[in-house]
Amino acid sequence: RADKVHILNDDFAVTWAGSVSEAQLITKLIRAELKLKEIRTNKKTNAKETANLLGGLIYSSIRRPSMLPGIAHFLLGGKDTDGIHLYDLFPDGSVTKIPDYVSSGSGSVFAYGVLETKYNKDMTVKEGIELVKLAVNTALQRDSASGNGINIVVVNQNEVKKVYRKE
Protein backbone atom coordinates (compact mmCIF):
# COMPACT_ATOMS: atom_id res chain seq x y z
CA ARG A 1 0.00 0.00 0.00
CA ALA A 2 1.34 3.35 -1.00
CA ASP A 3 -0.15 6.75 -0.31
CA LYS A 4 -0.61 8.37 -3.73
CA VAL A 5 -1.40 11.88 -2.48
CA HIS A 6 1.36 13.96 -0.88
CA ILE A 7 1.49 17.50 0.45
CA LEU A 8 4.85 18.96 -0.61
CA ASN A 9 4.75 22.16 1.45
CA ASP A 10 2.28 24.88 2.49
CA ASP A 11 1.47 25.67 -1.15
CA PHE A 12 1.58 22.46 -3.22
CA ALA A 13 0.45 18.84 -3.28
CA VAL A 14 0.95 16.02 -5.77
CA THR A 15 -0.73 12.80 -6.72
CA TRP A 16 0.96 10.12 -8.72
CA ALA A 17 0.43 6.94 -10.67
CA GLY A 18 2.96 4.44 -11.94
CA SER A 19 6.11 3.04 -10.40
CA VAL A 20 5.82 3.49 -6.64
CA SER A 21 9.56 3.59 -5.98
CA GLU A 22 10.13 6.15 -8.74
CA ALA A 23 7.25 8.35 -7.58
CA GLN A 24 8.39 8.19 -3.95
CA LEU A 25 11.93 9.19 -4.94
CA ILE A 26 10.74 12.08 -7.12
CA THR A 27 8.41 13.26 -4.34
CA LYS A 28 11.34 13.36 -1.89
CA LEU A 29 13.49 15.18 -4.44
CA ILE A 30 10.89 17.85 -5.27
CA ARG A 31 10.30 18.52 -1.55
CA ALA A 32 14.03 19.01 -1.04
CA GLU A 33 14.42 21.17 -4.17
CA LEU A 34 11.53 23.43 -3.16
CA LYS A 35 13.01 23.90 0.30
CA LEU A 36 16.49 24.60 -1.11
CA LYS A 37 15.11 27.11 -3.61
CA GLU A 38 13.21 28.89 -0.84
CA ILE A 39 16.33 29.05 1.36
CA ARG A 40 18.57 30.24 -1.49
CA THR A 41 16.22 32.90 -2.85
CA ASN A 42 14.35 33.81 0.35
CA LYS A 43 11.05 33.49 -1.51
CA LYS A 44 8.51 30.79 -2.27
CA THR A 45 8.36 29.25 -5.72
CA ASN A 46 5.31 30.00 -7.79
CA ALA A 47 3.18 27.31 -9.43
CA LYS A 48 4.83 27.54 -12.85
CA GLU A 49 8.33 27.25 -11.35
CA THR A 50 7.26 24.30 -9.21
CA ALA A 51 5.64 22.50 -12.16
CA ASN A 52 8.70 23.03 -14.35
CA LEU A 53 11.06 21.90 -11.59
CA LEU A 54 9.00 18.74 -11.08
CA GLY A 55 8.86 18.16 -14.85
CA GLY A 56 12.66 18.37 -15.00
CA LEU A 57 13.01 15.81 -12.22
CA ILE A 58 10.59 13.45 -13.97
CA TYR A 59 12.41 13.90 -17.30
CA SER A 60 15.81 13.21 -15.75
CA SER A 61 14.50 10.07 -14.04
CA ILE A 62 13.51 8.38 -17.30
CA ARG A 63 16.90 9.24 -18.82
CA ARG A 64 18.80 7.38 -16.07
CA PRO A 65 20.12 4.01 -17.19
CA SER A 66 18.48 1.36 -15.05
CA MET A 67 17.64 -2.34 -15.06
CA LEU A 68 14.20 -1.39 -13.79
CA PRO A 69 12.89 1.64 -15.64
CA GLY A 70 10.78 3.87 -13.46
CA ILE A 71 7.76 5.54 -14.98
CA ALA A 72 5.63 7.91 -12.92
CA HIS A 73 2.83 10.31 -13.83
CA PHE A 74 2.19 13.26 -11.51
CA LEU A 75 -0.60 15.76 -10.97
CA LEU A 76 0.39 18.97 -9.18
CA GLY A 77 -2.07 21.25 -7.46
CA GLY A 78 -1.12 24.41 -5.69
CA LYS A 79 -1.50 28.06 -4.94
CA ASP A 80 0.56 31.20 -5.39
CA THR A 81 -0.06 34.94 -5.63
CA ASP A 82 -1.74 34.45 -9.02
CA GLY A 83 -4.34 31.96 -7.75
CA ILE A 84 -4.98 28.22 -7.72
CA HIS A 85 -3.25 26.03 -10.31
CA LEU A 86 -3.44 22.47 -11.61
CA TYR A 87 -0.79 20.76 -13.75
CA ASP A 88 -0.52 17.38 -15.46
CA LEU A 89 3.06 16.06 -15.63
CA PHE A 90 3.54 13.09 -17.94
CA PRO A 91 6.21 10.42 -17.46
CA ASP A 92 8.33 12.10 -20.17
CA GLY A 93 8.52 15.29 -18.07
CA SER A 94 6.10 17.32 -20.17
CA VAL A 95 4.05 19.88 -18.23
CA THR A 96 0.46 20.83 -19.10
CA LYS A 97 -1.57 23.46 -17.22
CA ILE A 98 -5.12 22.20 -16.68
CA PRO A 99 -8.03 24.67 -16.45
CA ASP A 100 -10.57 22.49 -14.63
CA TYR A 101 -10.03 18.83 -13.71
CA VAL A 102 -7.74 15.94 -14.56
CA SER A 103 -7.29 12.29 -13.68
CA SER A 104 -4.34 9.94 -14.05
CA GLY A 105 -3.54 6.28 -13.68
CA SER A 106 -5.11 3.11 -14.99
CA GLY A 107 -8.48 3.90 -13.42
CA SER A 108 -8.67 7.38 -14.91
CA VAL A 109 -10.90 6.27 -17.78
CA PHE A 110 -13.55 5.34 -15.23
CA ALA A 111 -13.03 8.50 -13.17
CA TYR A 112 -13.38 10.64 -16.30
CA GLY A 113 -16.80 9.13 -16.96
CA VAL A 114 -17.97 10.56 -13.64
CA LEU A 115 -16.06 13.86 -13.90
CA GLU A 116 -17.28 14.64 -17.42
CA THR A 117 -20.92 14.13 -16.50
CA LYS A 118 -21.02 15.69 -13.04
CA TYR A 119 -18.32 18.41 -12.88
CA ASN A 120 -19.53 22.01 -12.65
CA LYS A 121 -17.08 24.92 -12.46
CA ASP A 122 -19.30 26.62 -9.86
CA MET A 123 -19.28 23.69 -7.39
CA THR A 124 -18.69 24.31 -3.71
CA VAL A 125 -15.72 22.67 -2.00
CA LYS A 126 -18.11 20.22 -0.32
CA GLU A 127 -19.67 19.29 -3.67
CA GLY A 128 -16.19 18.90 -5.16
CA ILE A 129 -15.15 16.54 -2.38
CA GLU A 130 -18.26 14.42 -2.96
CA LEU A 131 -17.54 14.34 -6.71
CA VAL A 132 -13.94 13.22 -6.10
CA LYS A 133 -15.15 10.47 -3.75
CA LEU A 134 -17.56 9.24 -6.42
CA ALA A 135 -15.00 9.41 -9.25
CA VAL A 136 -12.24 7.62 -7.32
CA ASN A 137 -14.64 5.03 -5.92
CA THR A 138 -15.88 4.31 -9.45
CA ALA A 139 -12.27 3.73 -10.56
CA LEU A 140 -11.54 1.53 -7.53
CA GLN A 141 -14.54 -0.69 -8.24
CA ARG A 142 -13.62 -1.22 -11.89
CA ASP A 143 -9.81 -1.26 -11.90
CA SER A 144 -7.84 -3.52 -9.58
CA ALA A 145 -4.60 -1.57 -10.17
CA SER A 146 -6.13 1.68 -8.84
CA GLY A 147 -5.44 0.80 -5.24
CA ASN A 148 -7.82 0.50 -2.34
CA GLY A 149 -8.35 3.87 -0.70
CA ILE A 150 -9.34 7.47 -1.21
CA ASN A 151 -7.30 10.49 -0.12
CA ILE A 152 -8.52 14.01 -0.83
CA VAL A 153 -6.51 17.21 -0.51
CA VAL A 154 -8.17 20.61 -0.94
CA VAL A 155 -6.14 23.53 -2.25
CA ASN A 156 -7.52 27.00 -1.69
CA GLN A 157 -5.96 30.44 -1.33
CA ASN A 158 -5.50 29.89 2.43
CA GLU A 159 -4.12 26.37 2.65
CA VAL A 160 -3.32 22.96 1.22
CA LYS A 161 -5.03 20.45 3.49
CA LYS A 162 -5.92 16.76 3.61
CA VAL A 163 -9.65 16.68 4.17
CA TYR A 164 -10.61 13.03 3.60
CA ARG A 165 -9.02 9.62 3.92
CA LYS A 166 -10.66 6.22 3.58
CA GLU A 167 -8.89 2.87 3.38
Indicate residue ranges for each PLM-predicted region.
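Short gly/pro-enriched beta-turn/loop segments at secondary-structure junctions
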Residues: M67-A72, D80-I84, G147
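Short arginine-rich
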Residues: V136-S146
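Hydrophobic beta-strand positions in blades of beta-propellers and related beta-sheet-rich domains
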Residues: I84-D88, I152, V160
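Acidic, glycine-rich active-site loops and adjacent beta-strand->loop/helix elements
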Residues: V20, D80, G93, A135-N137
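Acidic-glycine-rich active-site phosphate/pyrophosphate-binding loop
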Residues: L76-D92, E167
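Conserved short S/T/G-enriched processing/targeting/catalytic segments and their helical context
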Residues: R1-P69, V95-L131, S144-S146, N156-E167
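A broad, low-specificity signal marking well-ordered, structured residues that form hydrophobic/aromatic
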Residues: F12, F74, Y87, I150
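Short hydrophobic alpha-helical segments used for membrane anchoring or interfacial signaling
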Residues: L76-K79, V153-Q157
